[in-house]
Structures are given as C-alpha cells and as structure tokens.
Amino acid sequence: MPSMLVLVGTMPSLASLVSLGGACASVSGTSSSDASYALVKRVSLSRRSVKGTKKWLCRYSVSSSTTTTTADFIADQNNNSVSIDSNSFRGSKDGDDSEVVLKQTPKPVLKPPVARVERGLGVNTAPWSKDLSNGGKFDGEEERNKVIESLGEVLDKAEKLEIPKPGNKEGGEAVKPSQPSANSSNSRNGSYANASDGGTRKTKTMKSVWRKGDAVAAVQKVVKESPKIFNRGVQTEPRTREEGEVNAKAGTPLAPPQPPFRPQPPVRPQPMLQGKPMVAPPVKKSPILKDLGMAAKPLVSEEVDSSVKSKERKPILVDKFASKKKGVDPAASQAVLAPTKPGKGPPSNKFRVEHRNKKNASASPRRRIVAEDDGDDDASISRSGRKGRKWSKASRKAVRLQAAKDAAPVKAEILEVEEEGMSIEDLAYNLAIGEGDILGYLYSKGIRPDGVHTLDREMVKMICRDYDVEVLDADSVKVEEMAKKRQTFDEEDLDKLEDRPPVITIMGHVDHGKTTLLDYIRKSKVAASEAGGITQGIGAYKVSVPVDGKLQSCVFLDTPGHEAFGAMRARGARVTDIAIIVVAADDGIRPQTNEAIAHAKAAAVPIVIAINKIDKEGASPDRVMQELSSIGLMPEDWGGDVPMVQISALKGENVDDLLETVMLVAELQELKANPHRNAKGIVIEAGLDKAKGPFATFIVQKGTLKRGDVVVCGEAFGKVRALFDHSGERVDEAGPSIPVQVIGLNNVPIAGDEFEIVSSLDVAREMAEARAVSLRDERISAKAGDGKVTLSSLASAVSAKKMSGLDLHQLNIILKVDVQGSIEAVRQALQVLPQENVTLKFLLQATGDVSNSDVDLASASEAIVFGFNVKASGSVKKAAENKGVEIRLYRVIYELIDDVRNAMEGLLESVEEQIPIGSAEVRATFSSGSGRVAGCMVNEGKFVKDCGIRVVRKGKTVHVGVLDSLKRVKENVKEVSAGLECGIGMDDYDDWIEGDIIEAFNAVQKRRTLEEASASMSAAIEEAGV
C-alpha cells in the first residue's frame, strides 16, 4: 500500500481537510500508529519541485491551547509523506486566527482501556487522490473551493445535531486520560505529547465554537469510535485512541527533521466530531420493559463481534450539560410490559430502592430495553449473566400451594363399593378428605382402628352418608366371567389350520361320579387313590377313544366338584370344547350342578348331560330330565337340543354311547388349530415340587410347545427343561389341545394365566417384571384378613360398653398347599365362615412343603401352620415343637375347614348364661345384727346359698347380686326348698319391700359358635340404632 497523507476527522484532534476541528495524522507505510491531535486553523496546498522531483506541499497551521504550529508536508511521487518545515512556539497568535473558545464541562466518566485495534480510515477520511500524487495536473483554486464547500457543509449539519445526555452509554463512549507515548520523541509531533507532561499552565475552559459538545479536560481519554459506518464508500473499523500520542513510522529511509524540544502545557482534548453517516439512523423501536428481577441484557462488550456492534447507532456529539431527562419517544409510549414469572416477589423497601439507584447511577436502568427485532439479530449470541430471577420464598410457596390445589382430589358424588369393602386410603381420596378424618370418625364411634386398612361395605356406606355421597354396590368379577372362552385363531393361522383333538371337561356336583366315569374311560383307578374320595385338583388326561373302529385322541379334564373349587371349574370350562355335566339319578340337580352349567354356558361350549347311577336304588332319570328342562336344558328325546345319556359309570353301562355322542358333537364343531407356530395356551394348574422345583400344567391351544423354548406366563418365566405327559413320560413336544407338565420356570405361576413363547430370556424377563409390578398391589389387597372393620365390630364395642377400644379377635394363618389352585379353594371355603368377631389373616400362602422358615414366621407372629396335601419333615416338626408352633396337615378340605372353625370359636369370649333354679316372694322385712333381712316364701324350685338372685319389683329388675345369708328359723342353712319360709340377706342390698319377687339362678360360662356371635352382633346393631 503506498504511503499517503491520511486525514482523519474527530472532534478533539487535528482537523482533516474535510471536517474542520478533526484530527490530522501522518501515516507512513502500511502500519498505523498513534498521532498528535490539535485544532487546524489554516490549510494550503501547492505543488513545488524539490531536488528535481515533483512533490505536493501541504501547509497547515495548528492551534493547541496557546501554541500555534506551522508545518509543511510534501508528498513525493511515491506518496511518501515528509515534513520539510516545522515551527513550534508558545503564545503565537494571528490576527484572524484567534484562539478557539471552548465550553467548560464536568469530567467525563472513565472507562477501562480497551484492547488496541488496528486503525483504519476514519469516518471523514479524505485520502489524497492517486492521480494527483503521481504528478497529474492540479488546479489549486478548484481544490481549495471544494474543501471550503465541504467544511461549511459539515458545520451546518453539526449545529443541527441532537445531543443526548452525557454519561449515557448509548450516547457515546467514555474517554481515557491521555498518556505520553514511549516513542513520542521519535514522532513528528512529539512536542505536543511532551507538552502534556511538562506543562504547568492552568488550563482555561472557554466557550467552544461548536456550541454543543463534550467538555475539554486535561485527562487521558479512551475514545472508541462508532462501529462500522459506510460513508462515501469508505468503511471504518472500531478503534481506540490515546489522545496526545503520535507514533508515525517512516515509510522511507529519509527521516524528517525534528524541531528542538520545548516544554508545552497540557493538551486540551477537544470534543469528538463524527461524520454523519449517509444512511439515516433507524427509527427507535418501542422498548419492552422487563421485570427488575429479570437478568439485565448485557451491553455489547469487547468480546462481541464487530458485526454485532455495527447494529448499535450512537449519537455523534455528546453534551455533558444536556438535560438528564430524555425526550419522550413517541414509539416508547407504546411500550409493552413483558409477562413476569409466576409468584409474587418480595416487597421492595427504601434500602433496596436506594441501593439500586446508587448502583445504576451511571448505567442504564435495571429494566431491560429489548428491541422488537432482538430475536432476529441476537439469536445466535450467547449472553452471559443470570438466566433469570431467583424466586423468593413467598413465590415458591405460592406456586407449591397452587400446584397442590390443582392436584387435590375431587369429591365423588357417587361411589361404587365392592363386596369386600374399601381401603381407608381410597375412601379418603374419593371423599376428598384426609385419612385422619376417617380415623377420627371411627374413634368417635368407639373403634380403635389400629392396624386397620380396610372398611367393609356397610361401614363405608355409613361414612359416606355423613358426607352426602351416594354408594352403589359394585359386583365383583363373577366366576362365570373367568370361564369365558377366548378366541384362539389369528388371521395368519387360517391357511395353516389342521384338525386337533377335542378338549372335554367333566363337571358336576361332588360325589356324582365324575372321576369314576373318567376311570372307566381311562381304564384306571384314580378315584380309589383320591383322599376322602373327592377330587381336589384338575386332572388332565389324553385318552384314545374308539370311533367307528378307529382310535381318536381326546383330552379329558377332571375338575373338582366341591363348592370351594369354583375357580378351578371356571378354568376348566374356559379351555374346553365340550362339557359333560354329570348328574346323579338319585340326587338330582345340586348347587354345584347349577354352577357347572353356568360355567359351560358362559364359555359358550356345547353341553352333554350324563345321568349317572341309574343302577342305584331310588334312581329317577325322568325326574332329573324334568329338572334340567326347567332350567333351560331340554333333552333331545323331548324335542330339545341337549344330548342326554343315561349311564352307570361304575359298571360301564352306556359309556360307549356317551363317547360316541361326544365325538359326534366334536366333529360338528370342526375343531382346528395351527401347529406350525410358537405355542400359546393357558396354565390350568401350577405348584412346587420338592425334587423338580416349580412346575405347571399347560394346555396348548395353538402352536407346538417344544423342549428348549423360552416361555413366559404371568410373572414366571424360564426355559423349558423337560416336558411330561399325563402318565409322567418325557416328551419332546406338545401340539394343540395336548396337556403337558412343564419344568424349568423360575417360580410358580398363577393358575389361569396365559403362556406364550418368546425369542429370548431377556425378553421374557422384561415381560415378567412388567407383569409382576401390576400384580404386586393386587396380591397385597387380595390377602384375607388384613384388618377389616365392620359394622358388627362396631356393634361389638357398643354391646360390650367398651367405648375405649374395639373387641376384635384375629387368627393368623400360614397356608402351604400342593398346587396353586388349592390356595383359591381353601380361601374361598374359609371366607364363608362368619368373621364378625374373629377375622382371618393369611400371613403366607404358598405352594410346597412346610419348611423351617414357615415355622420361624409362625413363631414370630403367633400363627398356626395349615398344610393341605403337603408334608413336613421330622426336623421341621421338631423345630416347631421346640418353638411352640402348631402344624396341622390335611388331605381333605372338609377337615381343614372344621378345624379352622374350631380355632376361630376358641378365640371368642365365653358368655355367661343364667339358669333359673327358684323363685320366692317377700312377705315381711325385719332387722338383724347384719342388717335388714327379707322374710320370704319359696314358691317354686329352691334357694341355695351363694347362688345368684335377682330382685324384681313391679316387673323391673332393681338389683342383681349374690345370696350371702340364708336362714331357716334363725339357723343358717345351705338350701331351702319350695313351700318353706326363709330369711334372705345380701351384703350390698337391704332395700326390701313387701311384694318383691326374688329369682334365684346359677351363672354358667358357655362357649359361643360363630353363628351365635354373628346373631349377637346383629342384635347389638339394632339395639344401638346404628
């Protein structure tokens, strides 16, 4: 870049040729350095020849404070700037060039120095024309006119500028005290820099010719020029200057002559004059005042890119004496307050207001002024500082209260309550009250609900009545719903269906001959080996039946007939294709017969009636058929659609006809399944074997189950290690409709769960864990005897006059059974027992033999261990004996139910029963040494000493006590019979009146039954008016 004389125009420095009052800096070479600034008074241009070269001469006269300097510059053909004459003297004044008068202003606010930036061309830069510097023709008069015209134009525009108040960061930059440069002695104008160090003359502040402008102070200033502004095609870069310094580096070997050093007074910095940009400043956007608590928008700092700085438009001239009150911008009157954060901040006080005012005295207010287009301009700028206002404690509390109010439960108007009642927690939630309110209600009624979690339906109704909530009885899921048969076909299976064996379930009342019929079909003796002669589990068997001379496979399920095994019958009906209902010809339809028929109808399976025991005396098949027709099962012989076959299972009479009928019905159903897919089915039974571990009996409904498959059923999963058929033989696979026992599960599944084959153990584990989470709460609530409070319990407290507590007994039970289905059966049988005074609590219900851990649990909780179809080893029995734990093992469910009943009745308190033994009438009263004595005539029975007597006066009992003294003719006797007179005395009563009736009785303690206790509770409820 060729050297040239660069004229930069800013107010308190050497004026350029374009703007008077600017600064003139001599720049040599390609590097820029600091320059000396002063006020230009005269500028003249001429061309002269020096030593045979054509050069341009620039003569200017500068006035700085009281010093006037005249310097000559020449520019050679290479545009190198060289000084050929320089004079500096103090107190020089010309007639026309009077000293500049400046206005006095306060000291500007200092700002820390900013990093030095490469200096570029100024706003009003007037570079030398390249053509002229290379020796072109120059018309001095024409150029002089152009300069004068441009200077006048600048003066006119400067007088019209609006000057914002000083100190505002928006109006200009703070200045920095000038410091003499280390290399100022080498610079061409070094004398001016040195004058600030050695000058002692007092600076005079006078009125400025600019009328408006910054004050003049002999302090160092840091002047940051405006950001990039395009003016006359020249782009300026932001830079920092230190006033009073000139660092001009010569671009040629020729060194300029230096004037002799003379001390000078301090240089007066002049107000800056920035050239007015060609593009008009944008209209001020309406500010958005944010809350004081919000983070203030950071000002553009040195780290921010210069492209961001260029978006800020700052005034050119700054007047320190301008009014601090800004003019009202019309756009600012339409400012919109931004929404604040939720919650009310802490109230402001005087101290905070004063502190805020002091802190922001020289800065902008704490309220952010956000332009409407900030979102577009500053979208990519990362702003430092706080993210937002910290909420006060009151704000956080208000938000928490509002959130709690929104999440508060809503009072229900109608509440459905199931038969087993409702927990206290659920009731409190539905009534939108606290659990303490319900507990307080129970205490007010004389109930101490310690450890109580569930209220029965009647108690819930009574509580809801006080809160004006209607209660509806919600029926629990009936067993018929469990028996509903599910669809086993998928669309992808329709093209691969094959015939499958029918699944036939034998159902009916207990002891009607179901297992005997199956024994004849299987040619086995299962019934003889059953405990008590009754079936207590589902038996699945595969049998080959001869049909038309060919053997066809059938699967028979033998279900229990006892009332306690309703769930088992429902599961049997759910997987069956045909239901055989066995009815004894000598007994007719019984309760379990009706239940089995209901299960079959719910499962929508065909029904075949087998009227059994026709060879027995008193058998009446016609009566049975008539009873069946009365409940909707019309025999085919009578024009109906229900096949009925009269058989004798014991002798095998007509059993073949029954099988032929069953196979005909199965053929009409066209039973098919897809064996070429992963197996799916249902668990009909499950248990824990001491040698095999957890096992389960599956009925495959579709697909083929193979050894090695990964199976998941409910919360149990595992890899199939072994498969056993109904006879105990190992098999490798099981197709549709085939029952099979599976070994390899991690725990005992729940009977009735569906199983399916998955790809890996990880998938099976995830599915089992998800299922376990959903079943955990159901299992907890399903435990019987978890402390239920009933109206009978309330009546017990009322009748016993025990208002301080609840007279409630509890029997803790640990139940161990052989298979999962037996748990359901035992619990259903025990739930039938009245539990108004004694409740049952099952601490543990599991499959497997009795173990030492069961004994430890029973010892800690004072429970009884009941085992059903399980065993207890000798070591376990010995440990139980040492710890005082009772173990009861049963093979028949009848015996278990009877013993549990006896245990519950043993916890009931005995009642006192008064047995009358005699009656007497008071004929006279007399006094004796021991008090008043009643002379009586024994009308009936006898009176015995120390027996109980009751004094009845006018039909009302006035006293009940013990006969303490009995005399006959002044002699103490033990007994007085009817028809004799005697004297009767009591230690605690002597208010005898003639005509009183005295009744004698004996008090005996009598044990109550559960039914008697329940009746007494009902009477207490009525008496209490609850």
UniProtKB/Swiss-Prot annotation:
Coiled coil: none annotated. Residues 158-173, 306-317 have a biased composition (Basic and acidic residues). The keyword DNA damage does not apply. Residues 533-537 are annotated as: G2. Residues 158-208, 230-284, 300-393 are annotated as: Disordered. It is found in: Plastid, Chloroplast. GTP binds at residues 508-515, 558-562, 612-615. Residues 508-515 are annotated as: G1. Residues 384-393 have a biased composition (Basic residues). Pfam families: EF-G_D2, GTP_EFTU, IF-2, IF2_N. CDD domains: IF2_eIF5B, IF2_mtIF2_II, mtIF2_IVc. Residues 612-615 are annotated as: G4. Residues 1-63 form a transit peptide. One of its GO terms (cellular component) is chloroplast envelope. Residues 558-561 are annotated as: G3. It comes from the Eukaryota. Residues 648-650 are annotated as: G5. One of the essential components for the initiation of protein synthesis. Protects formylmethionyl-tRNA from spontaneous hydrolysis and promotes its binding to the 30S ribosomal subunits. Also involved in the hydrolysis of GTP during the formation of the 70S ribosomal complex. Belongs to the TRAFAC class translation factor GTPase superfamily. Classic translation factor GTPase family. IF-2 subfamily. This is Translation initiation factor IF-2, chloroplastic. It comes from Arabidopsis thaliana.
